[in-house]
Swiss-Prot record:
Protein name as annotated: Deoxyribose-phosphate aldolase
Family of the protein in this entry: Belongs to the DeoC/FbaB aldolase family. DeoC type 1 subfamily.
SMART domains, per database record: DeoC
Location relative to the cell: Cytoplasm
GO BP: 2-deoxyribose 1-phosphate catabolic process; carbohydrate catabolic process; deoxyribonucleotide catabolic process
A Pfam family reported for this protein in Swiss-Prot or TrEMBL: DeoC
Gene Ontology terms: cellular component: cytoplasm
Native source organism of the sequence: Desulfitobacterium hafniense (strain DSM 10664 / DCB-2)
Function, in words: Catalyzes a reversible aldol reaction between acetaldehyde and D-glyceraldehyde 3-phosphate to generate 2-deoxy-D-ribose 5-phosphate.
SUPFAM superfamilies xrefs: Aldolase
UniProt keywords, alphabetically: Cytoplasm, Lyase, Schiff base
Catalytically driven reaction(s): 2-deoxy-D-ribose 5-phosphate = D-glyceraldehyde 3-phosphate + acetaldehyde
Active-site residue list: 92 (proton donor/acceptor), 156 (schiff-base intermediate with acetaldehyde), 185 (proton donor/acceptor)
Keyword Cytoplasm assigned: yes
Amino acid sequence: MRTMNLAGMIDHTLLKPEATEKDIVNLCHEAKQHKFATVCINPAYICTAAKLLHGSGVGVATVIGFPLGATMTEIKVQEIFAAKAHGAREVDIVINIGWAKSGNWEAVAKDITRAVEAAHCCGVTIKVIIETSLLTEEEKQKAAEIVKASGADYIKTSTGFAGGGATVEDVRNLKAWVGQSVKVKASGGIRSRETALQMVEAGADRLGTSSGVQIITV
């Protein structure tokens, strides 16, 4: 089982709309203390987190087109450039879920490919959220194929805002569909060490959770 450096696989996450600047400061202190991979926060707090985490080895991740994915592609691209300029090292972007459910896969692919190109142009790691709880198995596989073809760094299960999170089955399937060329981030509902380890065993390379401290200290 891949359990080495579990803390280094965690995106310490706080995306609640009611999160205060004090909450973000506390999140960053926890991330530095436990050496998490990143903090994952809303874009308005990138500068705050970047200053607090400078030189710590903990990265700043933010979200793009979040949580619905229905933002215009041009806006997603500008969000990526702005995130980089303010200090983000990684971005988690949501596919246009409505297009996916409509079977408009060409539009989904164009949207994600442009975002990936923008991210890589400015040296940012990009994770593509497909919102597994809203897709059929066939749609999940098609989305995974598009993410793989786009050249994205990660495929991510969930936003955590759509009523369902990561499952072991989804993580295992996504890993099988994208192979070794794309990493997998499991996110949503990961609140215990046991669940975290199950996700890693299924193929997750990164874990998105607001329960990181609890996971690594029990």
